[in-house]
């Protein structure tokens, strides 16, 4: 029986090598579950699931205070420096079915560095994988998480100005996913403050989608 005082949200991270997926996953979990480091090659080679502690009184739903638990699936970079596209895609497909086959996926987060232009085949490869794995309704279950957003401030840009000057490819994608995006900053904010801000934004997306989930076989 579902506990009305608790809610679990299931998230999956997608993105290119060195986009900051594992680091973003650790912020979402409030832990260091995922190995994250700078390297000239892909670091993550297999999917892994992390679970956060309960965030008590995170939100109110139906007049009740609800504790939130976050489950995050970290995936290998795509394209990968050592693994074939076919292998990575199959690995992620099996992980989605294993971890979210019954509970379902609330949101796929496309992790994209804010200081890397969104253009060319490499940046669209992860989007294509999301489309193939999530199916025709992928737009309703996908958001963009921009990492290294402090680079935007360093360049003297606001978030709105940054998006206004973005590539047509990024603008088209944002239109497709109903402008679901969130920025992650490394400087000037505590990890907990970042985490809460990002989770609040993610919960807005999930609520707008009526708490629906995608299930996998």
UniProtKB/Swiss-Prot annotation:
List the Gene Ontology MF annotations in alphabetical order. Answer: GTP binding
Q: Which Gene3D superfamilies match?
A: P-loop containing nucleotide triphosphate hydrolases
GTP-binding: is it a keyword of this entry? yes
Q: Would the keyword GTP-binding be found if you checked this record's keyword annotation?
A: yes
- Output the Pfam families linked to this UniProt entry: AIG1 (PF04548)
**Disulfide bridge map:** none
Entry binding sites for GTP: 15-23, 36, 148-150
Keyword vocabulary terms for this entry: GTP-binding, Nucleotide-binding
Instruction: Quote the InterPro entries the UniProt record gives.
Output: G_AIG1 (IPR006703), GIMA/IAN/Toc (IPR045058), P-loop_NTPase (IPR027417)
Residues annotated as domain AIG1-type G: 6-217
Q: What PROSITE patterns does the record tag this protein with?
A: G_AIG1
Identify its protein family.
Answer: Belongs to the TRAFAC class TrmE-Era-EngA-EngB-Septin-like GTPase superfamily. AIG1/Toc34/Toc159-like paraseptin GTPase family. IAN subfamily.
Protein name, as recorded? GTPase IMAP family member GIMD1
Species of origin = Homo sapiens
Gene this protein is translated from: GIMD1
């Amino acid at each position: 029986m579902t506990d009305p005082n608790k809610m679990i949200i299931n998230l999956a991270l997608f993105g290119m090598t060195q986009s900051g997926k594992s680091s973003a996953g650790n912020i979402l979990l409030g832990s260091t579950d995922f190995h994250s480091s700078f390297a000239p090659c892909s670091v993550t080679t297999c999917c892994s699931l992390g679970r956060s502690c309960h965030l008590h009184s995170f939100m109110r739903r139906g007049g009740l205070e609800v504790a939130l638990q976050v489950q995050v699936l970290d995936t290998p970079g795509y394209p990968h420096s050592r693994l074939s596209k076919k292998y990575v895609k199959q690995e992620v497909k099996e992980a989605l079915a294993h971890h979210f086959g019954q509970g379902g996926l609330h949101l796929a987060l496309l992790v994209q560095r804010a200081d890397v232009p969104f253009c060319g085949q490499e940046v669209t490869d992860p989007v294509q994988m999301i489309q193939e794995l999530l199916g025709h309704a992928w737009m309703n279950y996908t958001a963009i998480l921009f990492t290294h957003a402090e680079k935007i401030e360093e360049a003297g840009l606001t978030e709105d100005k940054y998006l206004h000057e973005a590539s047509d490819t990024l603008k088209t994608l944002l239109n497709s996913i109903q402008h679901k995006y969130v920025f992650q900053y490394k400087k000037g904010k505590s990890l907990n403050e970042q985490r809460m801000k990002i989770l609040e934004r993610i919960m807005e997306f999930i609520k707008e989608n009526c708490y629906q989930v995608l299930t996998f076989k």
